[in-house]
Amino acid sequence: MSALGESRTRLCDQFAFVSGSDSAVAQCYLAENEWDMERALNSFFEAHMDSVFDEEAEKTEVTGNKRKDDTAEASGTKKKLKTDNADCIDLTAEEPTCSITVNSKENQAENGTAKSEVEDSKLSIISWNVDGLDTLNLADRARGLCSYLALYTPDVVFLQELIPAYVQYLKKRAVSYLFFEGSDDGYFTGIMLRKSRVKFLESEIICFPTTQMMRNLLIAQVTFSGQKLYLMTSHLESCKNQSQERTKQLRVVLQKIKEAPEDAIVIFAGDTNLRDAEVANVGGLPAGVCDVWEQLGKQEHCRYTWDTKANSNKTVPYVSRCRFDRIFLRSAKTAPPVTPDHMALIGMEKLDCGRYTSDHWGIYCTFNT
């Protein structure tokens, strides 16, 4: 095969991986767009993604009553997360009730302290690649995400692989959150801030100049309990053969973490697609920056966020278990240190549709501030 043929074959493989399509579809869109990856992906998304939630809305109108009956009949038969409209959420409340934050007066008296005060001082986050590019059961899976938001009521949510229709769905339901995105074309990242807990100051988008997959770095400046925070998320270049580009993007991320003001806490969370050797190749994390999973003792139960052995959303002929999704923390130099408190994987329950919320597990993490 010629060098040109090999190059185009690699482009087709990358397009198919990112878009969730096959090589024939990839070749068609790439050829129509002069083998420009970004143009081809944009063309694909415009053609395929916009109608996903519209179709689901029509389906819901017809089958809404029946689905309530079916859900009732199915309850207790299998371990599944309930996502019907009644149970899913009302995220409109500023202080939703959930098992994590509710404490009875009796328990508070028994313990001698008001636990809610302790909980209020903790910062909670969720980071999740929601696989918006997979349109199968996408509305069901978006409702699943909303159920987890209602359960955990995180202060900050970092999301990757969003599409415009998914964002509009979330904005209609998660009205207690401020939402901003890394783009409005194709697929992109986003950050959600709980309005009653986090004050937004400003945001910026840092482009990765040589990305072939529309990737960038989204940064938000906020305050939490009077403390300045820099929140960052990204979806670094995918695929094993994109290690060089992914490493370049990691260098940009780490440089931006180092450049943040000394009086600010920095939290980066996202789908890095990183292998440990790639982190080592850039000299490891800078002084003062920690990998939260490592800081918490490298707990095995929350190591693999991409796990085709346990997660059946993607049909692949091999087992792949990787720690693609990572959280980096840098404390402020001129303020009391922030320490990781707890980390867990979420999204490990199947939804009523028989699939998981995403092909990635989400990460729920809390910090002592």
Curated annotation (Swiss-Prot):
InterPro entries: Endo/exonu/phosph_ase_sf, Endo/exonuclease/phosphatase, TDP2-like, UBA-like_sf. GO terms for molecular function: 5'-tyrosyl-DNA phosphodiesterase activity; DNA binding; magnesium ion binding; manganese ion binding; nuclease activity; single-stranded DNA binding; tyrosyl-DNA phosphodiesterase activity. The gene is tdp2. SUPFAM superfamilies: DNase I-like (SSF56219), UBA-like (SSF46934). DNA repair enzyme that can remove a variety of covalent adducts from DNA through hydrolysis of a 5'-phosphodiester bond, giving rise to DNA with a free 5' phosphate. Catalyzes the hydrolysis of dead-end complexes between DNA and the topoisomerase 2 (top2) active site tyrosine residue. Hydrolyzes 5'-phosphoglycolates on protruding 5' ends on DNA double-strand breaks (DSBs) due to DNA damage by radiation and free radicals. Controls gastrulation movements and left/right (L/R) axis determination via smad3-mediated regulation of cdh1/e-cadherin. Pfam families: Exo_endo_phos, UBA_4. This is Tyrosyl-DNA phosphodiesterase 2. Residues 59-71 have a biased composition (Basic and acidic residues). The active site is at D271. One of its GO terms (cellular component) is PML body. It is found in: Nucleus; Nucleus, PML body.
